Amino acid sequence: MQVLRNSGSWLLLSWAGHGMTRFVGIAPAKNIHTGAPRLEDSAARQNTEREAAPSRFSLYPPVPGQESSLQWAGMKFEDVPIAHIKATYNNTQIQVVSATNASLARASCGTEGFRNAKKGTGIAAQTAGIAAAAKATGKGVTHIRVVVKGMGPGRWSAIKGLTMGGLEVISITDNTPVPHNGCRPRKARRL
């Protein structure tokens, strides 16, 4: 009987033809025995219900203050601790703060034993990231948001170090200051 009903819905679709606009879509099997006006009403009602229901999933993290059902370790997005990474050409500094801006962990390439030109390398930034992650996980941090500032060579290495240290990164934000033709830049290096 079900096969007969499904073939009936196909017949109704083919009956509508190419030029006719009476039939909106494929009718469910239970609506075949109803009249054409009622069939159009039910199809229109289903379309408006689909359009009216908003999708709860978003590819982007929620805006602060916006309601969201997403949670990490039982915390809302606004309550997840933040790792601030300042990547300069000479050093990389990492500070992990709570949602209330209380410092949880701090590390830099200089505090990890790298000196002079070695502080500005990716290996030093990765080591500083691992050290900051170890200090933060000791205080119970499991998930983290990352805010990166600067264009140094340790940008991505520091994030990799945080993940290698056991923290799960849920968002990465680039907060590098960009002048809109502000101060005159420093002179170009002559090699």
Swiss-Prot record:
Main location: mitochondrion
UniProt signal peptide: none
Biological-process GO terms, alphabetical: mitochondrial translation
Biased composition (Basic and acidic residues): 38-53
Keyword Ribosomal protein assigned: yes
Pfam family, any one: Ribosomal_S11
GO terms for cellular component: mitochondrial inner membrane; mitochondrial small ribosomal subunit; mitochondrion
Entry's Gene Ontology molecular function annotations: structural constituent of ribosome
InterPro entries in the record: Ribosomal_uS11 (IPR001971), Ribosomal_uS11_CS (IPR018102), Ribosomal_uS11_sf (IPR036967)
Superkingdom of this protein's organism: Eukaryota
Record note on quaternary structure: Component of the mitochondrial ribosome small subunit (28S) which comprises a 12S rRNA and about 30 distinct proteins.
Name this polypeptide is given: Small ribosomal subunit protein uS11m
